[in-house]
């Protein structure tokens, strides 16, 4: 997105006790701390952490990252474990927990699922505010005795995924996972609410073919791309096979078999 179309935001402390934390976030994100009557979004700092609120009468409510309670906790406890389609897509099997690079981390939901299954997950998020929400959520998760071991398997990097993958230093991830932004067809209230935040801030991933190319060059074993079930494949090489669910599809680009150990 260009600066001319970027939405206006300001940072707001929800209590006097959070004023200093709000000041630090405003400085880090380069956003004004004072109230802005023309702001479209408020970055709010409260006792329960960081959240973003779309302002105006039709606001869907705040969006935050919470790995301890809510949807993530429910999926961790009742989501089907290694039988979930995402687990099959990345190659989770008995004795096999691949190292995963989630190159389009967003709010970290899929990365958290993989980490909860025992995978070491590196998350990359290019939009600084979304990355801040994710950082805040991981920090709070690290203080919870039940979730801290999962959060410890998640490492967050900020920046452009394609650039980071091209300049990767060290052991390559076995699996690169991509979930590019697209016009969502998911009708759930949660996804609608998050899309109203994401789309103005992030826009669609028009660089998905470049992401796929960089992922295929880096991953040692496979690349997995999550798509809407009826969406075309990303421009470039064709996937080896796909796993299809009710609303989503996982296109798998295998390079070599994952082994135990």
Swiss-Prot record:
Residues that bind S-adenosyl-L-methionine, according to the entry? Answer: 109-110, 125-126, 179
Main location per UniProt? cytoplasm
Transferase recorded as keyword: yes
Write out the GO cellular component annotations.
cytoplasm
Pfam families xref list: SAM_MT
Highest taxon above the source species: Bacteria
Q: Which reaction does it catalyse?
A: guanosine(1516) in 16S rRNA + S-adenosyl-L-methionine = N(2)-methylguanosine(1516) in 16S rRNA + S-adenosyl-L-homocysteine + H(+)
Any GO MF annotation of the entry: rRNA (guanine-N2-)-methyltransferase activity
| The enzyme's E.C. designation | 2.1.1.242
Q: Where does it live in the cell?
A: Cytoplasm
Arranged from A to Z, the UniProt key words for this protein are: Cytoplasm, Methyltransferase, rRNA processing, S-adenosyl-L-methionine, Transferase
Against HAMAP family, the record matches this protein to: 16SrRNA_methyltr_J
Per its database record, what is this protein's job?
Specifically methylates the guanosine in position 1516 of 16S rRNA.
Membership in a protein family:
Belongs to the methyltransferase superfamily. RsmJ family.
Q: What is this protein called?
A: Ribosomal RNA small subunit methyltransferase J
